[in-house]
Design a protein with these regions (language model features):
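C-terminal substrate-binding/catalytic lobe of Rossmann-fold NAD(P)-dependent dehydrogenases
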Residues: 1-166
C-alpha cells in the first residue's frame, strides 16, 4: 500500500482517512485474554489503536495545542521499507502465536479438545482472518499436536528470528 498510486498518480496512503471503527471482536478477544491469563499484546494494541484513531476530533484539537516532532527521515528508504515489511510480518506471526495460546488456555479451562490445524484451515476458508501461511500453521500442528507455542515450530522459529532485527 505504501507504493500504490491512485488514478491521478498520487500515493493512495495519503488519501486514506485515519479513523477506524470496531465491530467488537478485537475487544472480546482482549477481554478473553485477560480472563484466561493469556498475553495478547499485539491484538490489544491494535484495539487501542483503533480506539484512538476513532477519536479524530479530539486528535485534531490536541494537535492545535500540543507540538510534536516534525516528520523527517534521513535514512535508507529501501532498508526502512524492508524493515517495515519484516516487522509487520513478525507482528503477524506473534499475533497468531498469541491467539493460539489464548485458545489453548481457554480449552484447558473449559475442557475443550481443539484441532488446531483444522482451525487454521477453517480460517482460511472464509473467516475474517485469512493468510497464505495458515497452511504452515496446520503443518506445524500436524507435526506436533502438543506444540505449546507456534513460534517453537522450526518454520515459524526461522521466520521470527529472521525478522527480529526489524
Amino acid at each position: 500500500i505504501l507504493a500504490y498510486k491512485d488514478e491521478d498518480g498520487n500515493p493512495l496512503v495519503d488519501k486514506i482517512l485515519d479513523t477506524a471503527g470496531q465491530k467488537g471482536t478485537g475487544k472480546w478477544t482482549v477481554l478473553a485474554s485477560l480472563d484466561y491469563g493469556a498475553p495478547l499484546t499485539l491484538i490489544g494494541e491494535a484495539v487501542y489503536g483503533r480506539t484512538l484513531s476513532s477519536q479524530k476530533d479530539e486528535r485534531v484539537e490536541a494537535s492545535k495545542i500540543l507540538s510534536g516532532p516534525k516528520p523527517k527521515f534521513n535514512g535508507d528508504k529501501k532498508q526502512f521499507i524492508d524493515d517495515l515489511m519484516k516487522a509487520l510480518y513478525a507482528s503477524k506471526l506473534v499475533s497468531y502465536a498469541q491467539g493460539y495460546v489464548l485458545m489453548k488456555y481457554a480449552a484447558q479451562e473449559l475442557g475443550w479438545k481443539l484441532n488446531n490445524g483444522g482451525i487454521a484451515l477453517m480460517w482460511r476458508g472464509g473467516c475474517i482472518i485469512r493468510s497464505v501461511f495458515l497452511g504452515k500453521i496446520k503443518e506445524a500442528f500436524d507435526k506436533n499436536p502438543d506444540l505449546t507455542n507456534l513460534l517453537l515450530d522450526p518454520f515459524f522459529k526461522e521466520k521470527i528470528e529472521s525478522s527480529q532485527a526489524a
